[in-house]
Design a protein with these regions (language model features):
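General beta-strand structural signal in soluble alpha/beta enzymes
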Residues: 26-27, 63, 92-95
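Alpha-helical support elements that line or immediately flank enzyme active sites
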Residues: 60, 67-81
Length: 183
């Protein structure tokens, strides 16, 4: 949130930067691969309105296409395990094991607790008065439940431990979210 307003990444970061001279925003596009000069990435290939195009960059190219499409674009561009790329007839630009591997599901278990007092956001939202109060709190002060995200806190921890109580993995294996609202 920014000043009590929930917003997207586009609203928070892209909109304020959209008039920069070194930024060009294209919409309705689909990136199909990386553009190389030797082994250096200098841009991207993309399709817009059925037409193949490319965009070049004089500086650094940052690929941020999400957990699934980032490795897909790397592989389609020739970066990844050579044996996998060869199976699909993709020329190897840079053999890099691990690209496209180790994707893990993000399972979630929800635990609900009942409060003995009517103090939860759900309790406040269950009445017209409570809804009006929360709405006014946000309108007048940009604070309250409408000014923050759903998950108020979170952490990563080691749940799996050996017989001495030490973590069995180098990285955390469980994630917690604390939310003030339930469905």
């Amino acid at each position: 949130t920014h000043k009590g307003w929930r917003c997207s990444a586009a609203q928070a970061y892209l909109k304020p930067a959209r008039n920069r001279p070194n930024l060009r925003i294209e919409t309705g596009t689909h990136v199909t691969g990386l553009l190389f000069e030797g082994r250096r990435v200098i841009g991207i290939h993309y399709v817009q309105d059925g037409v193949s195009r490319s965009a070049r960059c004089r500086g650094e190219v940052l690929l941020a296409a999400g957990a699934i499409q980032t490795p897909q674009l790397l592989q389609l561009s020739g970066i990844g395990p050579a044996d996998l790329l060869a199976r699909f007839g993709i020329p190897v630009v840079h053999e890099l094991h691990g690209v496209g591997e180790n994707l893990q599901d993000h399972l979630q278990v929800r635990l609900y607790y009942e409060c003995t007092k009517a103090i939860t956001t759900n309790d406040q939202l269950n009445s017209l008065f409570g809804q009006a109060k929360i709405g006014l709190q946000w309108l007048l002060y940009r604070s309250g439940p409408l000014a923050v995200g759903i998950n108020q806190g979170g952490c990563f921890m080691h749940a799996l431990k050996d017989e001495r109580g030490r973590p069995v993995a180098a990285t955390p294996d469980i994630q917690f979210h604390v939310s003030t609202l339930s469905a």
